[in-house]
């Protein structure tokens, strides 16, 4: 039998806090920043970046990008839930924000743990490289080689040399889409260039 908390001091947490969706203390601090938020969220297979502003009637999304767009619109053949895809999602969101005249934001990672080099910070790095001004510490950003997927390419080369069958099994989705995983860094640059072209870049 579960004992229920009782007494005058007991306070029921807000529903979204109980559901693990909102940290209201962090949300209040973000409101004080008086700037839109770069909301970075990740799932097992995808990354989502949004520029969101507070409003009395509820949050307003000013610009957004979803990693599935990388595949459907820009020909991304890698996994949509990895670090390179997270960076490109943040980059795309940042360019869309700038196109709408939004230059400054604060990072909002929600209830995700602030792990250095994680996908939420790869999205931050993408938005920064797009040209946005977002306060941050350099130490949380993933290194360039990880953003480009060098770690995935190196792992693929090693497995291919040691166990070709395991290589075929582990990277089957890459191969089905016509991409050798060891060529992911070059593919990353190709997709990034396509995104830049969408916004008039070279």
Swiss-Prot record:
InterPro entries referenced in this protein's UniProt entry, alphabetically: Rbsml_uL18_euk (IPR005485)
Keywords: Ribonucleoprotein, Ribosomal protein, RNA-binding, rRNA-binding
Keyword Ion transport among UniProt keywords: no
Coiled coil: none
Record GO terms (molecular function): 5S rRNA binding; structural constituent of ribosome
One example of a Gene Ontology biological process annotation: translation
Entry superkingdom: Archaea
One family name in Pfam for this protein: Ribosomal_L5e
GO CC terms, sorted: cytosolic large ribosomal subunit
Assembly mode: Part of the 50S ribosomal subunit. Contacts the 5S and 23S rRNAs.
Function: This is one of the proteins that bind and probably mediate the attachment of the 5S RNA into the large ribosomal subunit, where it forms part of the central protuberance.
UniProt family annotation: Belongs to the universal ribosomal protein uL18 family.
Name of the protein described by the UniProt record: Large ribosomal subunit protein uL18
Natural source organism: Methanopyrus kandleri (strain AV19 / DSM 6324 / JCM 9639 / NBRC 100938)
Gene: rpl18
């Amino acid at each position: 039998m579960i004992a229920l908390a009782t007494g005058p001091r007991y306070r029921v947490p807000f529903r979204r806090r109980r559901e693990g969706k909102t940290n209201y203390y962090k949300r209040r601090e973000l409101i004080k920043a008086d700037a839109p938020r770069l909301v970075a969220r990740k799932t097992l297979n995808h990354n989502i970046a949004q520029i969101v502003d507070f409003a009395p009637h509820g949050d307003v999304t000013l610009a957004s990008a979803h990693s599935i767009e990388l595949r459907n619109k820009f020909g991304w053949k890698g996994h949509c839930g990895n670090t390179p895809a997270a960076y490109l999602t943040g980059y795309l969101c940042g360019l869309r924000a700038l196109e709408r005249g939004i230059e400054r934001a604060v990072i909002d990672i929600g209830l995700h743990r602030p792990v250095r080099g994680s996908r939420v910070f790869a999205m931050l790095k993408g938005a920064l490289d797009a040209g946005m001004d977002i306060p941050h510490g350099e130490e949380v950003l993933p290194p360039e080689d990880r953003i480009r997927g060098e770690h995935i390419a190196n792992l693929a080369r090693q497995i291919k040399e040691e166990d070709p069958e395991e290589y075929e099994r582990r990277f089957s989705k890459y191969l089905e889409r016509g991409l050798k995983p060891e060529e992911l860094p070059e593919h990353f640059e190709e997709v990034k260039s396509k995104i830049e072209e969408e916004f008039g870049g070279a």
